[in-house]
Amino acid sequence: MQDRRSSYDYEDLLACGRGEMFGPGNAQLPLPPMLMFNRITEINDNGGEYGKGLIRAELDVTSDLWFFGCHFKGDPVMPGCLGLDAMWQMVGFFLGWTGGEGRGRALGLGELKFTGQVLPDIRKVVYNIDVKRVMRSKLVLGIADGWLSADDTIIYRAKELKVGLFKQDAAVPAGG
């Protein structure tokens, strides 16, 4: 890894998506359109609700975002699974940022609640991840809680988000 800054802009996130941030074969973010945030505004390994790490990111919402045109015609809403995927993306980024090696895969979560929607008139989505635990053995496993806010109102809450980093010689779970 080149450096451990406390924030990253869009160009940095694209570099991570190209595999240029954490080294070959290690954690990568997806590239657009699946990259679900524009910037990481804060990342550390000693903050958050559990004192084990925090990562916060933002998505600028505009009515021309790709998913609004197809989900649903005449009733545009950001698919909830994309907000959830953003939280998994952030946990994987955190694991790479802390020096974890291997390719990232979402492994599940304990609980997810939606209490609102991201609609085209929303201006900004903020994602927050509070790291609960990082285990390092044959794989690197991160467990975290997260939330998503739309214009300062929390509308998604996820508990026990799980992401693993798998080295090339380790079996990567199917479907991840």
UniProtKB/Swiss-Prot annotation:
Annotated EC: 4.2.1.59, 5.3.3.14
Active-site residue numbers: H71
UniProt keywords, alphabetically: Cytoplasm, Fatty acid biosynthesis, Fatty acid metabolism, Isomerase, Lipid biosynthesis, Lipid metabolism, Lyase
Signal peptide feature range: none
Coiled coil: none
Pfam families: FabA
Main subcellular localisation: cytoplasm
Keyword Lipid metabolism annotated: yes
Lineage: superkingdom: Bacteria
Keyword check for Transport: no
Gene Ontology MF terms: (3R)-hydroxyacyl-[acyl-carrier-protein] dehydratase activity; trans-2-decenoyl-acyl-carrier-protein isomerase activity
One GO cellular component term: cytoplasm
The protein's annotated pathway: Lipid metabolism; fatty acid biosynthesis
Catalytic activity: a (3R)-hydroxyacyl-[ACP] = a (2E)-enoyl-[ACP] + H2O; (3R)-hydroxydecanoyl-[ACP] = (2E)-decenoyl-[ACP] + H2O; (2E)-decenoyl-[ACP] = (3Z)-decenoyl-[ACP]
Example of a GO biological process term: unsaturated fatty acid biosynthetic process
Location of the protein in the cell: Cytoplasm
Function, as annotated: Necessary for the introduction of cis unsaturation into fatty acids. Catalyzes the dehydration of (3R)-3-hydroxydecanoyl-ACP to E-(2)-decenoyl-ACP and then its isomerization to Z-(3)-decenoyl-ACP. Can catalyze the dehydratase reaction for beta-hydroxyacyl-ACPs with saturated chain lengths up to 16:0, being most active on intermediate chain length.
Subunit structure: Homodimer.
Entries under PANTHER family matching the protein: 3-HYDROXYACYL-[ACYL-CARRIER-PROTEIN] DEHYDRATASE, 3-HYDROXYDECANOYL-[ACYL-CARRIER-PROTEIN] DEHYDRATASE
HAMAP family listed in its UniProt record: FabA
Stated family: Belongs to the thioester dehydratase family. FabA subfamily.
Protein name (record): 3-hydroxydecanoyl-[acyl-carrier-protein] dehydratase
Organism: Rhodopseudomonas palustris (strain BisA53)
Gene name tied to this protein: fabA
